[in-house]
């Protein structure tokens, strides 16, 4: 992208430019979610004939050392508000693959998430830090399976817009103050440009930030509250257009008749 093209985008409304940058920031995690969908489909397609899901769940618990029961799977499906019990079980298969890639303890460590996203376990990455922090709801430096399900479900087409807006807000709220500050947005924009190998002049980046805060910071206190962010996103939906992956809904629709007839104990 050259400066003249970017300047034209800015002249026509920098919210579109910011939206493109925000979408670019989500590309690595979108790739992971796409991998989740593909792996889930493969889990269903390769299921041995006549093998009950109860048997598969028991195998999974033995291999991972976990104790997921049918009730736990059902509860996670209910919490997600979009995945079926069968899909949660399939996602558990993928979760285990990621969680044993470096440390085989049934939990996803930051290095394992980095390996899944960027094919390397080393190196500093602001985007990785933010994604890991958002996935790690308990703030115990690992991603547990229920946290994994919660994060993936945000991208489902049936997930309420409010949840998607909240996720995107927290992505930019680097210091977790409950507000998006200019420097935080700048850090994310610069990190996104570096990852995308897109070059923009410092003046153009500042102009994008100026326009964004002019539109979003309605009370002019040099920071964007959650309410202001919601209003901004509703006005400029391109900012979170990549927060919905139709393939997640396709996965749900692809297996509507698969009955989870399990005999695992509650």
Curated annotation (Swiss-Prot):
SMART domains according to UniProt: EFh (SM00054)
Q: Which UniProt keywords apply?
A: Calcium, Metal-binding, Repeat
Give a brief account of the tissues where this protein occurs. Expressed in shoots, culms, leaves and young spikelets.
A single GO BP annotation from the record? calcium-mediated signaling
Q: Where does Ca(2+) bind?
A: 217, 219, 221, 223, 228
Q: Could you say which residues are annotated as the site Involved in dimerization?
A: 196
Q: Which Pfam families has this protein been placed in?
A: EF-hand_7
Q: Which GO terms describe its molecular function?
A: calcium ion binding; kinase binding
What the record says about family reads: Belongs to the calcineurin regulatory subunit family.
User: What function does the entry list?
Assistant: Acts as a calcium sensor. CBL proteins interact with CIPK serine-threonine protein kinases. Binding of a CBL protein to the regulatory NAF domain of a CIPK protein lead to the activation of the kinase in a calcium-dependent manner.
What is annotated about its quaternary structure and interactions? Answer: Homodimer.
Recorded protein name is Calcineurin B-like protein 10
Q: Which organism is it from?
A: Oryza sativa subsp. japonica (Rice)
Recorded name of the encoding gene: CBL10
